[in-house]
Design a protein with these regions (language model features):
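Intrinsically disordered, low-complexity terminal tails/loops enriched in metal-binding residues
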Residues: 20-137
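N-terminal export/membrane-targeting signals
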Residues: 1-25
Length: 137
């Protein structure tokens, strides 16, 4: 019974954390996103620097838009203040290609109720804190 309660509270926290990441997305917030290739399917997003499950360093990006469960990120870096291009939605105002990341994460950090990692990934692996990512079903 206690284990079920702890699991339920953990899952609730995960959904609240995901909602906080999505709802608090603003253009001044720096996110750390896997940027291994243009066809990268890692969908790894965190609020702290580190490495993706594929081994690539996470790149500092800011969110341009959130659309239909996808985060659209500017690849210009943490200090960028670009807007999304009005003439080409696949680019930011500076002309660089945007990075699209699915935010409906299948794997999240399993630190527990006090978790501040904010790690979301499409693949199993390790969080930046060293804990295993847990599949949300």
């Amino acid at each position: 019974m206690k284990r079920t309660f702890v699991l339920a509270v953990s899952i609730l926290f995960v959904f609240v954390s995901i909602g906080a990441i999505v709802s608090s997305a603003d253009k001044s917030k720096t996110y750390y996103v896997c940027n291994c290739q243009d066809d990268c399917k890692c969908n790894f997003v965190a609020n702290k620097p580190g490495k993706c499950n594929c081994g690539t360093n996470l790149a500092a990006m800011h969110v341009l838009a959130i659309e239909k469960g996808l985060g659209i990120f500017c690849r210009c870096g943490a200090d960028c203040s670009c807007e999304r291009s009005k003439s080409d939605p696949g680019k930011c105002g500076c002309g660089k290609s945007v990075k699209t990341v699915g935010l409906k994460g299948k794997y999240v950090c399993d630190c527990g109720p006090g978790c501040n990692c904010g790690t979301i990934s499409e693949k199993p692996g390790k969080c930046h804190c060293g804990k295993d990512l847990k599949q949300v079903s």
